């Protein structure tokens, strides 16, 4: 469940991205499996290339068999994207052998497996990362998985990417080079850049500010402060708050117009003059509020632009609360489907 809930959090931002054509995944364990599976379930039709990078080719082979043939894996996985595997349900469920299980179907992009043992690994790694639109780092590597310069030089910065680093969980381990984080939090200057680059957000998105500042190797070694990281939950609340303000603003305009009509009909001349002054003051105050809200809306649009198209880095160290939430939902689903056994007063 830990790998599943970690991938759920990572893909919250991934599913909103404008471009997810080229997905790169480092690793071939449970974390990699769930990140790939959820990515395909959420945006599979938009993913054109899936590149899996791992030291052991056989582990990637096993991951793909489990992914595309969950009931009975074939002896040899066919990497041809035109090949559509069939699935078998458990015996006794009334389905004919070989009939495709629609509940297990996953879109099939073009899949490439890359291992460091390949003779042209450096060149292929460079090309794969440069073309990537999303990178999931799902290993326990103590050192960066690739040189920072691939993404930090002018050519590497042209394309906006979503990077999720979820494997390293100690201050001394870094899957992602700290220089990439430093560049991502660097302030944007008002003047035009000689080299065009994707929007930087000025912050790294994390699951927990306190824990990442102490435990996440990438964050610690990049020397980031509290003002340079933002919790993913806060981004969700900002969106909800912006939506609420817009609704309140529209409701306020309606109430103001209604008040003017009532005052004009029911009040005497003297009271009307007093009311007009109040309404003028109210309108002036409303205009100030509107200007304030316009500024907030621009900031909100800029935030959305960054999250959807810019360079976004998400770092996770794991939260126990997510285990409780996901576990509760799994129990609820099991109850609804009458699966498993409940032990009362356990």
Range-by-range predicted roles:
Residues 1-14:
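A glycine-rich, Thr/Ser-enriched phosphate-binding loop motif common to dinucleotide/cofactor-binding enzymes
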Residues 91-95, 105-219:
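Rossmann-like adenosine-cofactor binding region
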Residues 42-111:
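NAD(P)-binding Rossmann-fold cofactor-contacting core
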Residues 10, 17-43, 48-59:
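Glycine-rich adenosine-cofactor-binding loop
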Residues 21-22, 47-50, 111, 159-161, ...:
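Residue-level recognition of the N-termini of beta-strands and the immediately preceding loop/turn
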Residues 169-346:
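Adenosine-phosphate binding glycine-rich loop
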Residues 11-16, 328-332:
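Short glycine/serine- and small hydrophobic-enriched flexible loop segments
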């Amino acid at each position: 469940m830990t790998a599943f809930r970690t991938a759920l959090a990572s893909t919250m931002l991934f599913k909103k991205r404008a471009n997810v054509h080229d997905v790169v995944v480092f690793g071939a364990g449970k974390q990699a499996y769930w990140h790939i599976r959820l990515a395909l379930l959420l945006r599979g039709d938009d993913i054109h290339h899936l590149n899996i990078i791992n030291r052991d080719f056989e582990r990637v082979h096993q991951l793909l068999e489990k992914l595309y043939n969950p009931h009975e894996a074939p002896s040899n996985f066919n990497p041809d994207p035109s090949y559509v595997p069939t699935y078998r349900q458990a015996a006794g469920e009334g389905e004919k052998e070989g009939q495709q299980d629609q509940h297990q179907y996953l879109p099939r992009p073009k899949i490439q497996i890359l291992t460091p043992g390949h003779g042209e690994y450096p060149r292929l790694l460079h090309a794969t990362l440069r073309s990537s639109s999303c990178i999931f780092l799902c290993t326990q590597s103590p050192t960066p998985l690739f040189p920072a310069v691939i993404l930090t030089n002018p050519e590497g910065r042209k394309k906006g990417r979503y990077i999720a680093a979820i494997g390293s969980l100690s201050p001394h381990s870094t899957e992602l080079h700290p220089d990439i984080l430093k560049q991502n939090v660097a302030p944007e200057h008002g003047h035009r850049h000689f080299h065009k680059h994707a929007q930087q957000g000025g912050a790294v998105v994390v699951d927990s500010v306190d824990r990442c500042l102490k435990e996440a190797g990438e964050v610690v070694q990049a020397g980031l402060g509290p003002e340079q990281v933002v919790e993913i939950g806060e981004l969700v609340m900002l969106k909800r708050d912006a939506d609420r303000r817009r609704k309140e603003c529209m409701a306020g305009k309606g109430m103001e117009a209604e008040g003017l009509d009532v005052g004009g009909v029911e009040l005497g001349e003297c009271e009307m003059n007093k009311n007009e002054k109040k309404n003028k003051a109210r309108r002036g105050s409303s205009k100030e509020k509107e200007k304030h809200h316009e500024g907030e809306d621009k900031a909100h649009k800029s935030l959305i632009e960054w999250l959807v198209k810019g360079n976004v880095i998400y770092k996770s160290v794991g939260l126990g609360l997510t285990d409780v939430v996901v576990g509760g939902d799994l129990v609820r689903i099991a109850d609804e489907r009458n699966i498993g056994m409940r032990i009362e007063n356990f």
